[in-house]
Amino acid sequence: VTEKIKATSQAHGLRYPFDEKPQLGEPIEVADGVFWARMDLPYTLDHINVWLLRDGDGWVIVDTCVDMDTSRAHWENLFAGFMGGKPVHKVIVTHMHPDHVGLAGWLVNHFDADFHMSRTDYLMCRTMAGDTGKQVPEEGLRFYRAAGFNDEALERYSARFGGFGQHIHPLPQAYKRVKQDDEIEIDGHIWRIEIGSGHAPEHACLYCPEKNVLISGDQVIPRISSNVSLFPTEPMGNPLQDWIDSCHRLRGVIPDDVLVCPAHNEPFYGLHARLNALIDGHENSLTRLHEVCAAPRRAIDGKVFSVLFKRKIGREVFFMAAGESLAHL
């Protein structure tokens, strides 16, 4: 591990100890028995990190990538090569989004492995994947019409509806629930579950005090602020408050010197600085938004978007931006 450390890579109070990213089929060991693999995504965010944990005579996999032929081929390459044909004992998914859960069912079936996931995300994932092929509900149309969507935007929403499950292999019919403070033993070491909310309903991070490693999923990412959106399924929810509360809680229970292994970008040190930046970023946005909303505004108004986002909002990110805008309002 130490040969790959580059202590001088530092920015915004964060330190990135690895000067290279994993190549196809060649994971990098970031801590004893903890390996970082990287897979391609067909989205604007073009990659996901998945984590391989050595577990006696086999492996534990944390997060899985989307269900596509290229992703399956990447896993097959790892099985035959780096993983040495050894069994996978457990598949653990941090949360319900397709880039994390997409191949969980396939991996579990392939190895007859145990499947671990939080209850809320498991059930929500099955519900949303079950919408495939269904007609858009009137509640959704009413929700986005109230947000300011015009007929063209509503048509695009209708066309998108039911697409959540297109890159998700059917989930296992049974799972092992993970919840706050649960402990999972892997290779003789205890990994504690730390739950966050806001980006996903019940996002599970894995923290190992002995290794001083936090597998953070999308809950803490060094150079991306995870999307926090309000959806028509819970129109009176407050996911942004959930997110900020989760950041405060994690800062209080996880030490600052932990190695953070995120789902995107690179492993880093500086957990508390990053959590502070995430909290401050949203609170500053709320302050500016309060000023802008002295006059009536819609969630999708340009002035609202300009307060919340540094980039121009195009069609490819419009729905995510609208959801985040609604969460802030």
What kind of region is each of these model predictions?
Residues 67-71, 76-185, 212, 269, ...:
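Active-site HxH/HxHxD metal-binding segment of metal-dependent hydrolases
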Residues 4-34:
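N-terminal amphipathic/basic leader segments beginning at the initiator methionine
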Residues 59-69, 164-175, 183-185, 190-286:
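Metallo-beta-lactamase
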Residues 94-100, 199, 203, 264, ...:
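Histidine-centered divalent metal-coordination motifs
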